Structures are given as structure tokens and as C-alpha cells.
């Protein structure tokens, strides 16, 4: 939600609206994951990552894209873990979230005039 409120300038109005939609979707993702954690008999707890912001709209979009890339890698790993545990329905719910996260990634890369990042390199770096 923070990113959608700090972007200024006509060229960023479309992405600012999209970022506000992303924020609402992110809340739904958190609720879905919390329900799944509760289903597993655990207590959901979250320590949010600090939000990086900048006076420069382009930098703000870059920070958000970097966060989306990391989130995608994390969800891909959660899907593999769920499947390894035989929690196939849970993996499917996370896949649905992943589709939206990839849409967010596309929106941000497009706003930056870039190709969608290849997060497989991030995943490989985390395994080392």
C-alpha cells in the first residue's frame, strides 16, 4: 500500500492504481496463508520486512519489483515443501497466490520498461 501512495507524476498514475490493487490482493494472500498455518495447528506470526521507499518513483518501483521477485521465489519453495509433505490442496492455494504475484511482477517490470526478471537465478543463489 505504501508504494501506491508515494508515486507522483502522470506517467505513474496507472501503476499507482495497480499497486493499490496489489495491496488488497496481498492482504488476501496473508489471510489465506494464515488460515493454512492455523490448519496445520500453528499460530501465524509475521514480522513484516521494512519497506524501502525513495523520493524517485523509479527507485520505488524497483524496490517493489525486488520484493515481488523474492516473494515469488519464497512461494515456489513453499509449494515444493507442501507437495513433499503431501499437502497438495495447500500447494494449490499457494499456486493461485503465485499467479497473482507473477502478475504483480509483470506490472512492475512493464512500468519500469524492463523484461520480467528471471527469478531462477535468485532461487539458485539461495541454495548455496
Regions found by a protein language model. Give the residues of each.
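Iron-associated oxidoreductase/ferritin-like identity signal
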Residues: 1-128
Amino acid at each position: 500500500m505504501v508504494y501506491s501512495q508515494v508515486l507522483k507524476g502522470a506517467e505513474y498514475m496507472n501503476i499507482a492504481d495497480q499497486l493499490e490493487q496489489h495491496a488488497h490482493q496481498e492482504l488476501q494472500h496473508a489471510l489465506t496463508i494464515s488460515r493454512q498455518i492455523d490448519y496445520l495447528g500453528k499460530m501465524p506470526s509475521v514480522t513484516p520486512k521494512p519497506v524501502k521507499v525513495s523520493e524517485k518513483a523509479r527507485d520505488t518501483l524497483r524496490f517493489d519489483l525486488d520484493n515481488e521477485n523474492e516473494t515469488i521465489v519464497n512461494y515456489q519453495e513453499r509449494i515444493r515443501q507442501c507437495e513433499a509433505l503431501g499437502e497438495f490442496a495447500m500447494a494449490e492455494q499457494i499456486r493461485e497466490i503465485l499467479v497473482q504475484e507473477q502478475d504483480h511482477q509483470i506490472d512492475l517490470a512493464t512500468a519500469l520498461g524492463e523484461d520480467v526478471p528471471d527469478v531462477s537465478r535468485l532461487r539458485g543463489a539461495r541454495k548455496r
